[in-house]
């Protein structure tokens, strides 16, 4: 059971997890864990499933998925009958009015839909995941000199579950450098998995780029892959002018994570998100929603 904070009704909700029985079996049974290490965490498994989700045969999954998880298709640019395959549906674009952008330059917005955690006064040797598992920022970024620039800064971890909108966006005007890709495995990023596999974010395939924002300084913008995420697709053009809310990219099928790192004294995260993070609870947010303010 995954409990998260709903800031709209100021109460806790229970997340309905796609493939929950499979996740629990894989990460809680000896057979499942052995299968995970031998096969499921490997690129080959995610590629196979990604291949299926790119084929017309997978279209039959769409309506069941929509009904099971009560996905509001009135927000989508296209309806279910217009999608060619499951990945076409999974990476669907939303109507512009579905995700209004807070235009005030001092407001920090969420880069996507999902559940968010926030950490201030970043300790480079110990960043805390869901369930209290720690990992090293040095190991995550694999660049010690760059990592040191973010000592005592702020970290935001946005977890996108399979039922979420899976495109991610820029949080400010600015210019973004080329993407750096780091090889890794494909463990699940669901809290069920995070509690069983130490330092998942450091072990999984991930990509990051430096975003030179106009109002929040230089930000490390990282995307982390997960089980069945066949691809992390970057749609932005490096080293060109970017506007707040512009699309940066998207994930193909699977749960995935966006992580942002800010330098010291650049932002102040909203108190409700910070307080819930300290209690160990994620907060649900949508792309374009205000989550903090410029210092």
From Swiss-Prot:
InterPro entries: PS_Dcarbxylase (IPR003817), PSD-B (IPR033177), PSD_type2_pro (IPR033179). Its cofactor is pyruvate. One of its GO terms (cellular component) is plasma membrane. Pfam families: PS_Dcarbxylase (PF02666). The modification Pyruvic acid (Ser) is found at residue 256. Catalyzes the formation of phosphatidylethanolamine (PtdEtn) from phosphatidylserine (PtdSer). This is Phosphatidylserine decarboxylase proenzyme. It comes from Clostridium botulinum (strain Hall / ATCC 3502 / NCTC 13319 / Type A). The lineage of its organism: Bacteria, Bacillati, Bacillota, Clostridia, Eubacteriales. The gene is psd.
